[in-house]
């Protein structure tokens, strides 16, 4: 449970699921070996936690969805219902895994003298880590309270940390997920072109033929999930299907656009766990 909560928090404060998973999966597996817990249960908790937190307004998926909904006519603000819904969904999945693998029956292993983790002294945060935590707190407050662009604020904070010699710039550049950035940027350009040539309208017309107001949310979740098995949720699935929501909601009648957006993101989030 603690691994899930830590993973959720790390993902929600900005890095998103991909970056947070790179940290938390390694940490959770190492911790599971020390505690005698099944590694796949701990790693699953870490993954679900990061996926739940990535839809926060300052994290990767949340930012992508916000940008897409802001372009709609009229603009939609799905941040809060999206965060609540995806958080509940992933918490339920984590609870199911916890019960299936009998996490409630786990007992602390017996340690030899000097090997018990509880005997180790706590390590204090150093100067650079404290500065980084302060920067993350400022990012959250500025973005949520003053509605400023999360990317711009993040860059400014990164520059300030660099000027304070609180970061290793070379290491920071190496840790940037360039592949993800290029994928998301490239797909954004592609989707703009697709929209201009009528591709989104064509996709919307196809979807309208196979669903009604009762089945719309289920079908969108299913299609997004299956598509997410073979492609990136953030780079492909969400930018492709979210723009179809306004026309679908108008055509079907009685369907909430926010409900459809949540369905798309939920399907993409779970489908994105595919190898």
Model region roles, listed by residue range:
Residues 1, 84-202:
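Hydrophobic transmembrane alpha-helices of multi-pass small-molecule transporters
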Residues 5-9, 31, 51, 95, ...:
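Alpha-helical transmembrane segments of multipass membrane proteins
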Residues 59-60, 67, 187-205, 255-258:
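Hydrophobic alpha-helical transmembrane segments in multi-pass integral membrane proteins
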Residues 1, 68-69, 172-176, 203-211, ...:
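Hydrophobic alpha-helical segments of integral membrane proteins
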Residues 29-117, 256:
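Membrane-core helix-loop-helix motifs of multi-pass transport proteins
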Residues 2, 41-50, 174-184, 241:
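Cytoplasmic-side transmembrane-helix entry/capping segments in multi-pass membrane proteins
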Residues 2-30, 35, 40-43, 210-273:
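Hydrophobic alpha-helical transmembrane segments of multi-pass integral membrane proteins
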Residues 8, 12, 58-59, 86-102, ...:
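Transmembrane alpha-helical segments of multi-pass membrane transport proteins and ion-pumping complexes
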């Amino acid at each position: 449970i603690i691994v899930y909560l830590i993973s959720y928090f790390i993902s929600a404060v900005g890095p998103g699921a991909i970056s947070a998973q790179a940290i938390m999966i390694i940490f959770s597996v190492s911790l599971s070996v020390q505690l005698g817990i099944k590694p796949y249960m701990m790693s699953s908790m870490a993954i679900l936690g990061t996926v739940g937190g990535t839809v926060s307004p300052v994290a990767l998926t949340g930012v992508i969805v916000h940008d897409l909904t802001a372009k709609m006519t009229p603009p939609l603000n799905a941040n809060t219902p999206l965060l609540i819904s995806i958080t509940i969904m992933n918490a339920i999945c984590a609870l199911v895994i916890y019960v299936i693998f009998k996490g409630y029956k786990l007992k602390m292993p017996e340690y030899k003298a000097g090997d018990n983790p509880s005997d180790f002294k706590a390590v204090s945060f150093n100067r650079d880590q404290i500065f980084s935590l302060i920067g993350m707190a400022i990012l959250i407050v500025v973005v949520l309270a003053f509605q400023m662009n999360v990317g711009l604020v993040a860059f400014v904070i990164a520059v300030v940390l660099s000027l304070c010699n609180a970061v290793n710039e070379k290491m920071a550049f190496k840790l940037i997920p360039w592949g993800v950035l290029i994928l998301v940027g490239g797909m954004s350009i592609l989707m703009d072109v697709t929209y201009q040539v009528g591709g989104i309208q064509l996709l919307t017309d196809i979807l309208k033929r196979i669903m009604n107001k009762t089945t719309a949310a289920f079908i969108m979740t299913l299609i997004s999930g299956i598509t997410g098995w073979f492609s990136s949720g953030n780079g492909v699935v969400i930018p492709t299907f979210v723009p179809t929501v306004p026309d679908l909601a108008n055509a079907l009648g009685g369907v909430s656009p926010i409900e459809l957006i949540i369905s798309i993101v939920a399907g993409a989030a779970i489908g994105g766990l595919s190898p």
